[in-house]
């Protein structure tokens, strides 16, 4: 049989039990020294490298490990430092300040990484002097070598890096050309250190606009050819199909393609002869974004097809394994579902099984995985019938009529204030929840604690002067995991954590079966909170699109079917809240934009399905019940009309980290529904000033009708400290009170 090689694009940073997160947050809290942080992270990086070596990968990535974000690492590598942070030593503390902000300066913008739930720190080009200033990549490569690990460096490529940047007076092409000598310098340093090849991530080349980048892409890689480094470069794409004929014409040593999320196009291009056989093909055949075990037999068939059209083949995951949990080893799952799962470590095992089969004619591990997959597939998880047609998908009356009834019922002031939903999850809150889950305290003791915490924060909100209150979500660990624990058809793991942004980790539930609402999920806590105040308290739910996008979805049903199943379940909870007397119900959809396919040909259907699912979840309420929704961290221009079509009475949107850019999206649409554009950044410990909030309000009112405008933070306050929250909300309310007097 033909020999194949195995590789990886990236490995999770978090650690099996979030050691990475805990160390970084301990350093921020001044509980450990910088030396202790460095040692902990070095040990974790070593563990990651040696684990991948254990699974006989022919090449192991370095440069994927980071203290915060790999795009921010690249910014610091090339001295792309935001102007407000310039003049300081380029070190880890500067990196953290750019990412989080400090008492003097706001953080850089935080944006979704393509259509995933990972977020990157946006590079800023205003008044920068690019140069190679901090070559951590070289240091990490040499460290891997010291462990006798056959490593390859990973770096985001110049086309993608610049496209994901903002600011500066240069054109896109000029910025790329500015960076080319710097990339060359970095490449040369890595090659001189012994790098056999360098993985250059260019996922921007799978997007709709990729053809418009082809001229500058060719110019860039021709430059690298003239510098005698191009043959050591592998252009890596993922998340969608690439224009293979163009990529094959570039003078690089290899190409990386996604054969999982490409809708079959990349294989068709290979079979059509579009791949240059003089290059190495890095084939992403194992799903890097979902947790289901591979159909190992189908992967063997795919490899056979690829071998017929290549001279050198490397198999690997479809993308970095950053997007999946580390390992199943510590889980205690029902075998009926557990046998069908594969986390990052298990995906390496799948690669090893295929390597052994093709290179050594050793089918032991292959046969074992094949039998396991077949056992899982022989089970039935399609057991319920649904009546989608009987549920309303539009409100009874237009917004103009609804808002009159809602205002009469709620009696809200000019520029009403509210928060997005969650309040700080203190160590005490987390301890009580953990003790309850592990049966160390009784249900009664836990409920008493929750009620006390709810009551305390209702009073805090009233004292500050907010107009629409929330109960604080102290019973929830995560806005999706909470619903996954309570809805039928979901599985929640114990250690299935993935990185969302910075040290923020989430534990996505796994949808394995038909989704069903079986009992009220949030009614008790919300009704209790409402009993403590005359002000309206919002019911807080997560919408069907977000629950699906932030879960690991089942793959045996179309996405739309699963999404609508979730919508029916949320609709049941919405009606239960309304029946219990809750006047305002928020159904959050922060992930609606992130799920938008990278190719525009799929946008219309995705948005149509998303809008219908949201309406399925929210349209059955009476006119006087006010429906809110919330979205965050997104570039909304492409979907602004779909946002309007949701017909939510009020939508709140993150704008603070976009530094006002988002408001431009409303210039082309007459947005005639209620809206709150977040006026300060909750992801930073920095307390906003009254002037900053007033400026944000004034800018928003240039585009938004004052009678429709709400004032709120840009996201939930779960990750902030109590004093930070109280101080920031006090500033917000005082700014609004002053504005009302104008």
Curated annotation (Swiss-Prot):
Enzyme class, first EC level, given as a word: transferase
Pfam families: Meth_synt_1 (PF08267), Meth_synt_2 (PF01717)
Cross-referenced InterPro entries: Cbl-indep_Met_Synth_N, Cobalamin-indep_Met_synthase, Met_Synth_C/arc, UROD/MetE-like_sf
Pathway connected to this protein: Amino-acid biosynthesis; L-methionine biosynthesis via de novo pathway; L-methionine from L-homocysteine (MetE route): step 1/1
Residues that hold 5-methyltetrahydropteroyltri-L-glutamate according to the record: 18-21, 112, 550, 594
Record bears the keyword Amino-acid biosynthesis: yes
Positions contributing to Zn(2+) binding: 630, 632, 654, 715
Cofactor(s), by name: Zn(2+)
Example GO biological process: methylation
UniProt: L-homocysteine binding residues: 420-422, 473, 588
Recorded catalytic activity of this chain's protein: 5-methyltetrahydropteroyltri-L-glutamate + L-homocysteine = tetrahydropteroyltri-L-glutamate + L-methionine
Cofactor-binding details, from the entry: Binds 1 zinc ion per subunit.
GO molecular function, one term: 5-methyltetrahydropteroyltriglutamate-homocysteine S-methyltransferase activity
CDD domains the record matches: CIMS_C_terminal_like, CIMS_N_terminal_like
Positions contributing to L-methionine binding: 420-422, 473, 588
Keyword Ribosomal protein recorded: no
Active site positions, chain numbering: 683 (proton donor)
Enzyme Commission number(s) from the entry: 2.1.1.14
Family under the similarity heading: Belongs to the vitamin-B12 independent methionine synthase family.
HAMAP family: Meth_synth (MF_00172)
Function field: Catalyzes the transfer of a methyl group from 5-methyltetrahydrofolate to homocysteine resulting in methionine formation.
Name of the protein in its database record: 5-methyltetrahydropteroyltriglutamate--homocysteine methyltransferase
Organism lineage string: Bacteria, Bacillati, Bacillota, Bacilli, Bacillales
